[in-house]
Amino acid sequence: MLRLRPYKKCDAETIVSWFKDEETFYKWSAGRLGSYPLLADTLIRHYEEQEYTENFFPMTAFDEDGIAGHLLLRFPTEDKRILRFGFVVVDGTKRGRGYGREMLTLALTYAFTVMKAEKVTIGVFENNLPARHCYYSLGFKETSVTEDYAIAGRLWKCIELEITPEYSVSKTDGYALP
């Protein structure tokens, strides 16, 4: 069974160990944490810079064997009506077990019931098909917002997705990749 708890500094070493190659790292971070390889101290410092705000909530998923995933929840605007998910990752040795979907289902439940978000958004690179399939299966829908990132000498298109409580996975059978 997967559970969600607040991130702890001691999680950083495990989380950064999941990025075995540059492409995986950039699909996760969009370069916001510097270059590959990511060091645990870099992740810790980045999160420490935000820890005294009321809009930044890193979370860690765990199972009976330990840490299994990680994601970030943050309010991008002062009115705190929209919650943004980011830095979503599952331990590569645990992929294929439905942990990504389960972790995001827990996070969506938390977002809508505890944090009272009216909408949750997430960005995903067009070339990250497994993540896109996961998000669509939960009921996320594409918006018209896209952004291009220069990564490793190429342009990567980031697609903005959103979900509201009435379209969450608990109310649908999910959606297929468009």
Please report, for each region that a protein language model flagged, where it lies by residue.
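Extreme N-terminal starter segment of soluble prokaryotic enzymes
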Residues: 1-3
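Acetyl-CoA-dependent GNAT
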Residues: 6-12, 17-95, 104, 110, ...
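Short beta-strand(s) of the beta-wing in winged-helix/HTH DNA-binding folds
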Residues: 26, 141-142
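C-terminal "cap" of GNAT-fold acetyltransferases
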Residues: 83, 118-121, 125-132, 137-138, ...
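Glycine-rich phosphate-binding loop
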Residues: 98
